[in-house]
């Protein structure tokens, strides 16, 4: 199919004109739009072409135009304040909910898991949600089991909603067939697919709608509001009598439904709740909840002026961070979407190198929506509600005796003398799940572990015990094989050691 002349005017169709206010860089904006329209001409059929023209192009162009308008705009640091006491509820102060009230609220709830990520950072192919994390169960298995247990206990039907990306949608559709007899209703939808943008000239990277997947990206989990509306599921959930949606990352094993939080939301007519928790040294880069011009606002490190980054990382000033566990009133979401208020969500500019090209991705975060909802609040929750598995170091912790699995929920071992989780850093030799499994013959007893650092060519024997601070380093070209039953407490191990040497 011939490509249109990029210098010719665009068709005067409503879907290509209704993009709202223009930026000052009209030439760039117009050329970007023409490039998108040219991409649409490569669609395999009219249905796909019209879908891209009517839904994707307006969304892409709206985000790009706002980026052009605001790219030189910086946050006014002097207007940033810690959230006042009444903006962040303390979880410990929330009244306990009765069993009858729990059943009432559960009937109004839907649960959404953000399922767009791949397992590539852990050396796996396909959706990250199918990695086995505990007792041969995957992230998705645990999510389904939790909802199944809740539905049976309260005799209700809370649905599970999965927001996939173009990277995970097709395979997820096949995987969820295994749950068709589980009595858990699963809705699955695909979030948007935006073109990566060349950093030097701000033009789309792809020239075909279905060329290389590496030329496209999902525009962040903030797309959940728009994608839920575009899929028709927002309307479906409201029509089914659902009033509340609990959103979380599928890899956060601590993000289970908590009816004390939902009761506080319902009782106080709160439209949006962001769960936050106290920062540790490991969380200094996490987004934080602030008060800005009298409103609740999410502040991400990418928005912070370079001169203020160290201040942002300070635990003294910014004591909490966003867990990305979010509770939303569905009717309020529907209202603000129809009012186009979320079109002003903050844009995160994510620079990358892809296929040797310097590119940028324009992304939005689900937490950035907080400032557009009425009576929005944070809830400072226990650390146990933030248990993400981003690496094999995290996998090491959740597979250990630090936790047990009860009805799909990870519960910390009562014999752990501290409430904190140990800091574990496994080196590059453990980065892939396959290498991690080959090198660790059995997860050690870590009930009394504070910190573990492992670097180099190392293998763990079964039935080990680690306590306090343990550092194990194999020098370059050397190897350490730790024998079965070894016990280390506040110990540094280095050099070149083999089985039986310790």
Swiss-Prot record:
<feature type="binding site">
    <location>
        <position position="128"/>
    </location>
    <ligand>
        <name>UTP</name>
    </ligand>
</feature>
<feature type="binding site">
    <location>
        <position position="220"/>
    </location>
    <ligand>
        <name>UTP</name>
    </ligand>
</feature>
<feature type="compositionally biased region" description="Polar residues">
    <location>
        <begin position="9"/>
        <end position="20"/>
    </location>
</feature>
<dbReference type="InterPro" id="IPR002618">
    <property type="entry name" value="UDPGP_fam"/>
</dbReference>
<dbReference type="GO" id="GO:0003983">
    <property type="term" value="F:UTP:glucose-1-phosphate uridylyltransferase activity"/>
</dbReference>
<feature type="binding site">
    <location>
        <begin position="116"/>
        <end position="117"/>
    </location>
    <ligand>
        <name>substrate</name>
    </ligand>
</feature>
<comment type="function">
    <text>Plays a central role as a glucosyl donor in cellular metabolic pathways.</text>
</comment>
<protein>
    <recommendedName>
        <fullName>UTP--glucose-1-phosphate uridylyltransferase 2</fullName>
        <ecNumber>2.7.7.9</ecNumber>
    </recommendedName>
</protein>
<dbReference type="GO" id="GO:0006011">
    <property type="term" value="P:UDP-alpha-D-glucose metabolic process"/>
</dbReference>
<dbReference type="GO" id="GO:0031154">
    <property type="term" value="P:culmination involved in sorocarp development"/>
</dbReference>
<keyword id="KW-0548">Nucleotidyltransferase</keyword>
<feature type="binding site">
    <location>
        <begin position="249"/>
        <end position="251"/>
    </location>
    <ligand>
        <name>substrate</name>
    </ligand>
</feature>
<dbReference type="GO" id="GO:0005737">
    <property type="term" value="C:cytoplasm"/>
</dbReference>
<dbReference type="InterPro" id="IPR016267">
    <property type="entry name" value="UDPGP_trans"/>
</dbReference>
<dbReference type="Pfam" id="PF01704">
    <property type="entry name" value="UDPGP"/>
</dbReference>
<dbReference type="GO" id="GO:0000045">
    <property type="term" value="P:autophagosome assembly"/>
</dbReference>
<feature type="binding site">
    <location>
        <position position="251"/>
    </location>
    <ligand>
        <name>UTP</name>
    </ligand>
</feature>
<keyword id="KW-0808">Transferase</keyword>
<feature type="binding site">
    <location>
        <position position="221"/>
    </location>
    <ligand>
        <name>substrate</name>
    </ligand>
</feature>
<dbReference type="GO" id="GO:0031012">
    <property type="term" value="C:extracellular matrix"/>
</dbReference>
<dbReference type="InterPro" id="IPR029044">
    <property type="entry name" value="Nucleotide-diphossugar_trans"/>
</dbReference>
<feature type="binding site">
    <location>
        <begin position="114"/>
        <end position="117"/>
    </location>
    <ligand>
        <name>UTP</name>
    </ligand>
</feature>
<feature type="binding site">
    <location>
        <position position="191"/>
    </location>
    <ligand>
        <name>UTP</name>
    </ligand>
</feature>
<feature type="region of interest" description="Disordered">
    <location>
        <begin position="1"/>
        <end position="20"/>
    </location>
</feature>
<dbReference type="GO" id="GO:0030244">
    <property type="term" value="P:cellulose biosynthetic process"/>
</dbReference>
<comment type="similarity">
    <text>Belongs to the UDPGP type 1 family.</text>
</comment>
<feature type="binding site">
    <location>
        <position position="390"/>
    </location>
    <ligand>
        <name>UTP</name>
    </ligand>
</feature>
<dbReference type="GO" id="GO:0005977">
    <property type="term" value="P:glycogen metabolic process"/>
</dbReference>
């Amino acid at each position: 199919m011939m490509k249109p002349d990029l210098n010719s005017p665009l068709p005067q169709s409503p879907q290509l004109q209704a993009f709202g206010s223009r930026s000052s860089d009209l030439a760039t904006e117009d050329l970007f739009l023409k490039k998108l329209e040219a991409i649409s001409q490569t669609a395999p059929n009219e249905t796909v072409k019209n879908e891209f023209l009517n839904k994707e192009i307006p969304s892409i162009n709206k985000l790009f135009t706002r980026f052009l308008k605001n790219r030189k705009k910086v946050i006014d640091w002097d207007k940033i304040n810690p959230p006042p006491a009444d903006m962040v509820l303390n979880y410990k102060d929330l009244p306990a909910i009765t069993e009858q009230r729990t059943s009432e609220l559960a009937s109004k709830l839907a649960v959404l898991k953000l399922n767009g990520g791949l397992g590539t950072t852990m050396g796996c192919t396909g959706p990250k949600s199918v990695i086995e994390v505990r007792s041969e169960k995957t992230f998705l298995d645990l999510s389904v089991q939790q909802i199944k247990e809740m539905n049976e206990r309260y005799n209700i039907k809370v649905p599970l909603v999965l927001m996939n990306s173009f990277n995970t949608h097709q395979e997820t559709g096949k995987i969820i067939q295994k749950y068709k007899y589980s009595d858990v209703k699963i809705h699955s939808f695909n979030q948007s697919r935006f073109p990566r943008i060349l950093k030097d000239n701000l033009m789309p990277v792809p020239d075909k709608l279905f060329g290389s997947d590496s030329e496209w990206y999902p525009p962040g989990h903030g797309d959940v509001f728009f994608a839920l509306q575009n899929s028709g599921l927002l309307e479906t959930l409201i029509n089914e009598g659902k009033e509340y949606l609990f959103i979380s990352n599928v890899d956060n094993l601590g993000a289970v439904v908590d009816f004390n939080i939902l009761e506080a939301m319902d009782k106080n007519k709160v439209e949006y709740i962001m769960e936050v928790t106290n920062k540790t040294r490991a969380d200094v880069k996490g987004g934080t909840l602030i008060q800005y011009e009298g409103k609740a606002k999410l502040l991400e490190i990418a928005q912070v002026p370079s001169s203020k980054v160290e201040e942002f990382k300070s635990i003294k000033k910014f004591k909490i961070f966003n867990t990305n566990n979010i509770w939303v009133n569905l009717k309020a979401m529907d209202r603000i979407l129809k009012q186009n208020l979320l079109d002003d969500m903050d844009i995160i500019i994510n620079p990358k190198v892809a296929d040797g090209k310097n590119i940028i991705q324009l992304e939005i975060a689900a937490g950035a929506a907080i400032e557009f909802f009425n009576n929005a609040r944070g809830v400072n929750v226990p650390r146990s509600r933030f248990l993400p598995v981003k690496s094999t170091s995290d996998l090491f912790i959740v597979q250990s005796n630090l936790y047990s699995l009860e009805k799909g929920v990870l519960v910390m071992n009562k014999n752990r003398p501290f409430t904190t989780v140990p800091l574990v850093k496994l080196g590059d030799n453990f980065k892939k799940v396959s290498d991690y499994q080959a090198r660790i013959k059995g997860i050690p007893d870590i009930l009394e572990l504070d910190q573990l650092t492992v670097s180099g060519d190392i293998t763990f024997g079964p039935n080990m015990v680690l306590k306090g601070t343990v550092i194990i380093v194999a020098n370059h070209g050397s190897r350490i094989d730790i024998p079965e039953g070894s016990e280390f407490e506040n110990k540094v191990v280095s050099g070149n050691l083999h089985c039986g040497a310790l």
